[in-house]
A protein has these predicted regions:
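N-terminal Rossmann-like NAD(P)+-binding domain of SDR-like oxidoreductases, especially those catalyzing
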Residues: 1-157
């Protein structure tokens, strides 16, 4: 029996696939559900090495679909969420900001609402991690680095 069921959104993306692989391999008694819309940034080939693991499951879905998200949460009863699904390419944010708002804002709200709905009677032990992008810090010069205390300085929608 699996100890916990964890949802990873955007799990077929660059960072998400690394997170999925880490959890599948490090926590064999956890059920890892990878939810991805498989847009230009998602690629299931990133996860060929874990696709047949018994504790791994892929779900193709869009976090903007609030009904689908609530149904998925009700069926799987997630113990935790690692939310990486996002539109993050700056050039695309300039040419189509509406798509970014739907995915990054509405999609995140849909996940939070679904989590709240199934966790409302007992939040104990439940975790929701929202992963952002380094783009919120703006541009980095030739030297230096961003830290936990770096202020936000976004330059794109």
């Amino acid at each position: 029996m699996m100890k916990k069921t964890i949802l990873v959104t955007g799990g077929a993306g660059f960072i998400g696939s690394h997170v999925v692989r880490l959890f599948v391999e490090k926590y064999p008694d956890y059920h890892i559900v990878n939810l991805d819309k498989l847009t230009y940034a998602g690629n299931l080939n990133n996860l060929k090495d874990v696709e047949d693991k018994s504790n791994y499951e892929f779900v193709k879905a869009d976090i903007v679909d609030s009904e689908a998200m609530l149904k998925l949460f009700q069926e799987r009863r997630f113990d935790g969420v690692i939310h990486l699904a996002a539109e993050s390419h700056v050039d695309r944010s300039i040419s189509n900001p509406t798509e970014f708002v739907f995915t990054n804002v509405i999609g995140t709200v849909n996940l939070l609402n679904a989590a709240r709905e199934i966790w409302k009677d007992n939040f104990e032990g439940k975790l929701f991690y929202h992963i952002s992008t380094d783009e919120v810090y703006g541009s980095l010069g030739e030297e230096g680095l961003f830290t936990e205390t770096t202020g936000y300085d976004p330059h794109s929608p």
